[in-house]
Amino acid sequence: MERKAETKAPVPVIERHKSGYIKIRVAESLQDITLALKMYREGFTRNAAQRAFMAWKAMISALTVMNLDKLPRNEEERKWYHRVGYKAPKAGLRWLADRLEDIGYQDYKLTHITSTALALHRYA
């Protein structure tokens, strides 16, 4: 009699490379904000605004991945976080900031900074 192998749900890619992804996104954020400041000083305000937005998006992505176990409230949200949420898509940026504040980041004014970042993105 042949035994069927137990099939486990595959581990999402982001879970396998969590710490590396966080380090890369934080480094990207720091590089982008440094570049944004340089561009701003040189008079390239629209380019600087876009770089500042990208820096914030990378930071929200890093915070999201750091808290992947705490953020989802149900199975549907968990799937979304593992599929696209960890990338901090522009359309979900405000929602991610709200969720991060809900789980303990309220002192950092993430929604306020996110609103400013989105305004910079519109300007760019």
Give short role names for the model-derived ranges.
Residues 68-124:
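Long, charged low-complexity segments
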